[in-house]
């Protein structure tokens, strides 16, 4: 990882968004609409249906039809979220140092139209390599910030339900694995 440097300068970069899902017909429209409503428009979306048995694929396909930056795949058999994410991030990226990978599950959504702008600022203001977010559940329960002692002693895995499902990281970090 010696070659990974920060995105300190203000520049446009690409969000490489992966939406893996299985049987999300009640949620996938809200998820994809939340991406379409983003004020920051430099993104591509890889939607991966993991062999759903409901109408999830049809709903997603209708939403992303005629959108050049959306690609949808339907697996013929269950592959699992990790496999779908790996395959999506293994596609050729022209400028990996200017690309941020983002994973959002098909039953989640971006709360605000400024989420991508917010993330862009976080990546350009520091040498940020990876982010995790907080969350607000449909019942109004908000995720918590990690207490200082958890951060100090790197105890993240011992404290569940603090971070959300929204995960982002630099694509060049992905390539260095």
Question: What do these predicted ranges mean?
Answer:
Residues 1-177:
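Nucleotide-sugar donor-binding/catalytic module of glycosyltransferases
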